[in-house]
């Protein structure tokens, strides 16, 4: 069924299970919020897990914390404005938007150079505040990514949590730019970063595809139980599997088995090749979707 919410002003905040439409949540597959509504309150549609599509108006300026919490079936969000206008909406924490596809009525692109295969992945990551573009309006999808830059993307994906002062301990800690310092400290504390055997992190070195898979896998482990992860292992069939260093194989196996990383058309993974911004966006977009699926 379709639930239509109309009127002027705010949809009020609701405690769990107290919204008037909550009792009918099992029948609602589509939600339409009509023009005039300016805010969706805290917990408004929380628990309406079978909603698959949501239509939102240009008048909307705020979505409260948990307004769409546990809306696990959500596939599509239709918004009356542009991507830039969507980004301006104050969206609170705990909303199940991670793997949903955003469709904007205004097709204006946020970047001028993303017409390739990576387009949708970049848009997904941009909408989730994982990546940003350049001041000139480009994204530079073919540009290589450094280790510090990829950790920054994961830090953004994790919500940029506040981090107490953490001693990095790497011999090259002074090479970590202030721009990436909080992200790298978070990465160390979360166990995503371990560094090399010579006790360096090498923040400005370009990240390899195998390293990217490993960092992504460690991020996945923060949000998915060990029991679930245990069922995802198993050697993959990349034709160049033998060239994957032993320390990266578990990560590559799991990430490939759940579709977060993919190989090239010839069946190879090329673990030592440098990852680009477009490839990084693809991996992180798929990781968002995997986290949503594996947590449900």
Put a short name on every predicted segment.
Residues 106-117, 132-182, 190-210, 218-248, ...:
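Feature responds to low-complexity, polar/acidic, surface-exposed segments characteristic
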Residues 17, 41-47, 62-72, 205-206, ...:
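Repeated polar recognition positions within modular binding domains
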Residues 12-24, 85-97:
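Acidic/polar low-complexity surface segments
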């Amino acid at each position: 069924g379709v639930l239509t919410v109309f009127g002027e002003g705010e949809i009020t905040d609701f405690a769990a299970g107290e919204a008037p439409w909550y009792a009918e949540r099992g029948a609602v597959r589509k939600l339409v919020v009509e023009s005039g509504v300016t805010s969706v309150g805290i917990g408004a549609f929380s628990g309406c897990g079978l909603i698959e599509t949501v239509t939102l108006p240009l008048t909307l300026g705020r979505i409260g914390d948990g307004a769409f919490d546990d809306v696990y079936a959500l596939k599509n969000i239709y918004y009356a404005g542009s991507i830039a206008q969507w980004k301006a909406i104050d969206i609170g924490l705990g909303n199940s938007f991670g793997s949903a596809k955003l469709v904007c009525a205004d097709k204006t692109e946020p970047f001028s150079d993303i017409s390739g295969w990576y387009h949708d992945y970049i848009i997904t990551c941009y909408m989730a505040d994982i990546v940003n573009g350049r001041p000139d309006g480009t994204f530079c999808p073919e540009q290589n990514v450094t280790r510090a830059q990829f950790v920054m993307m994961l830090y953004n994906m994790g919500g940029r949590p506040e981090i107490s002062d953490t001693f990095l301990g790497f011999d090259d800690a002074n090479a970590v730019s202030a721009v990436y310092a909080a992200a790298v400290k978070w990465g160390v504390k979360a166990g995503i970063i371990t560094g090399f055997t010579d006790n360096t992190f090498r923040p400005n070195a370009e990240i390899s595809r195998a390293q990217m898979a490993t960092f992504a896998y460690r991020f996945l482990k923060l949000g998915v139980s060990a029991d679930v992860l245990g069922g995802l292992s198993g050697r993959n069939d990349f034709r160049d599997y033998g060239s994957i260093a032993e320390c990266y194989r578990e990560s590559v196996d799991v990430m490939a088995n759940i579709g977060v990383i993919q190989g090239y058309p010839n069946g190879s993974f090329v673990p030592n090749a440098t990852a680009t911004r477009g490839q990084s966006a693809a991996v992180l977009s798929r990781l968002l979707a995997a986290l949503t699926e594996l947590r449900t």
